[in-house]
Amino acid sequence: MAQPPSATTIPQVGDTSPRPSETSDDVSTLKPAAQASWKKKHGLHLGRSNSNHSNNSAKHEINRTASPKRTKTFWKSFKYLLDLTPKQVDDFMASYVIYSLDWADEEQMVKTLGPDYKAKVGDCLQAYYGVLNHLCALGDVEKMYIPPLMDKKSSVLDNQMLYEESIAQDIGLKPGDRVLDLGCGRGRVAAHMAAVTGAVVTGLNIDPNQIAQAREFTEQMGLQNSFTIQDMNELPLPFEDNSFDAFYQIQALSLCKDLPKLFNELRRVLKPGAKISLLDWVSLPAYDATNPEHAELMRRTKPLIGAVGTPTPETFEKALKDAGFAILKSDNASIDGLQAPLIDKADVYFRSLRQVILGLVKVHLLPPHFKTLINRLCLDGQAFVKMDTMRLVTTSYRIIAQKQ
């Protein structure tokens, strides 16, 4: 396998959105009933009945059947990071070069990575996620995404679980359904989806390290989910026509070089009438690439969230429609269209962790590469907060569509 580029420059330390969020209304329906609706319909024991939902003012429930065991997960990832080789650290740092590029600028891609740039991007993604997934597991972003803000009083992890349950509701999952998860990470979202609905998830991811963890976790949970190592830019997908009842992905599609080609392939493997859920990074109408402040914020934010492309909502909508999907919902899934409170929570936690790690490195209780890793991880979190509060970008843009 080709290696990530050996040298790169690592970056140093009024709503203009066209569509309002529906989330505040969604949550009033979802939060007591996200699990209870499946219990009522399918006999799954996931919480209290929703028979008195309309006048129920009790504390909202969140299904934790497949929630990560945080202490065990933390120490397992900590040990993995402790044992990293110098080459793994170097490859991880070098992999950030792809986030200074964009699929839309092929000339710069070729100039930086060479004519086989698509394969080089794939190699960089493996080097990047092979380390990043363990860094993220040191906090509440083991699933490697900042969720939409579904509940202002809840944690990052609880908002993740609320959003995942809303996906199941949006795409109508029921027991026995086969669901495709693109960019499945460690399989934690897939486990939660299966536990809540009784569906069976097939996950795809480019990183063998994460796939191995997903399989181990699924076996521990006693679930039937399965996982395949696959680069979404290497098509066709390894599935028969009309194989899946539904599809979802969370913040993976900026890594896709050819959205129309991928969506056509998804249409092939989905059954007629299947619904899909996309949650992704988009640039919003307020973003102006010619504005120096906007451009600098974008330069700092893309590496933080791991984005190669910078699609717009319209980019996704057109590609979906051209592939034969009808758009059912297209909006910002966060309350008030802002993720900043959750982004800031994660940033504050990891910056606090950074101080602990730097102290331990200083007294030689941790190896020096921990300083390199945590400094890179904590770089520019506030740039992301600022872009979100200025409504220039979001990673909580939601599209629900249906195969025609």
Where are these regions (language model features)?
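N-terminal auxiliary segments of SAM/dcSAM-dependent transferases
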Residues: H60-L138
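Class I SAM-dependent transferase core
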Residues: M109-Y117, D123-L173
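Conserved SAM-binding loop of SAM-dependent methyltransferases across substrates and taxa
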Residues: R186-T197
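Conserved SAM-binding loop
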Residues: A214-R215
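Conserved SAM-binding strand-loop segment of SAM-dependent methyltransferases
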Residues: G222-L235
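A short acidic, Gly/Pro-enriched loop at the edge of an enzyme's catalytic core
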Residues: L235-F247
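A short glycine-rich, Lys/Arg-flanked "PGG" loop and its adjoining helix->strand segment in the class I
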Residues: P260-K275
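Substrate-binding/catalytic lobe of Class I Rossmann-like enzymes that use SAM or dcSAM, i.e.
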Residues: T290-N291, E296-S396, Q404
